[in-house]
Amino acid sequence: MRLSFGEPVGALGILLVFGITASVISSVATGRLPVRTGPLVAVGTMLTAVALAVEASAPSLWVMAIGTVLFGLGFGAIDAALNGHAARHFGARDINWMHASYGLGATIGPLLVAALLSGGLSWHRAYGLMALVQAALAIVFIVGRRGWRESPRANASRAGEDKPRPGDGRARRRPPAAVALTSLTFAAVETGIESGAGTWGYVFLTVGRGLPAGTAGVAVSAYWAMMFAGRVVLGPVAERLGPARVPAAAVTGIPAGAALMTAPGPGLLAVIGLMILGLAAAPVFPLLTLMTPQWAGGSTGVTRMVSLQVAASAIGSAALPAGLGLAIGAVNARILAPSLLVLGLAMGSLYVFGSRWSRPTTPPVTPRA
């Protein structure tokens, strides 16, 4: 891509900045829109299809940047709308499986594009094929947009967000600023840990702990596999035990895994720590989304709160890995593990604070066939 544009590798970083900024703006705005999930998902998917078509025909980096902004706007709307819908309707199992599907797509997508490129297709055509797939999905969502109807209880919850009834103290209640900020910071730190461990795990294991390149590559792939498996397996566990118990164990497991990565010893110990970290982190963000009514003190403001959490997670997943990269460049690769340990402990403290101030609420509606 950079060769066809005649640009250095560093110039492609501009695309990342544009895409994340657009996604954050879109996520925040989505929480304030009165439209329902179906139209939002349909419009967002169509916008990503248009964005991929623009990118497929891009003659320069700046046209590619326009496509990236459009894609970020569409993706942010989809992400916030789906998570908001899940917070109002799903149980612990379903929301974890939804996020597991994100991970599966993120794993399969690059492999498919790599296969297309290896088969002789240019990246322009690969993007064009992805645009067609997204357009087909958009048509499916447009046709089925009425299938996202809110249940009567969820409609009452949604209406309460925008029009609290006079005399109803619970409907007027808003989360204290400190609790809201805690929730957003927690989301940013947690997703930053996930991305940071996955982004820099290979460098840490090879340069920092001296493992062979092949072993480190398998370990990092296994880390992402643990994220996927953890959401598939721990979702039903959280459904049975309650969504509050699993995150409490997970926020303990994340610093425990980072501590094993930090501890002196054979490289295998660091690999085990990375696996534990991945497994522990897997269900945290999905269950945070599910527990938003508790952190928000009731149904009021759930959709807006979730949209802000999605925006915070996008910022954290970009900013913290970048900061960890600067730390690795300034010190050495081994600094990753203690940095993750400190972040994990900070995340645990945020969770304890937020949980102390959260209020129990009725569980979300789980649709039945």
What does each of the following model-derived ranges do?
Residues 241-288:
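C-terminal transmembrane helical hairpin of 12-TM major facilitator-type secondary transporters
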Residues 24-62:
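Conserved MFS/SLC helix-loop-helix module at the cytosolic interface between two early adjacent transmembrane helices
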Residues 24-38, 230-243, 328-329:
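Helix-to-loop junctions at the C-terminal end of transmembrane segments
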Residues 176-229:
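Extracytoplasmic gate region of multi-pass secondary transporters
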Residues 298-333, 340:
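A late C-terminal transmembrane helix in Major Facilitator Superfamily
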Residues 76-90, 282-298:
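Intracellular juxtamembrane helix-capping segments at the cytosolic ends
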Residues 98-149:
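Helix-loop-helix hairpin linking two adjacent transmembrane segments in secondary transporters
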Residues 67-102:
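Cytoplasmic helix-loop-helix junction between adjacent transmembrane helices
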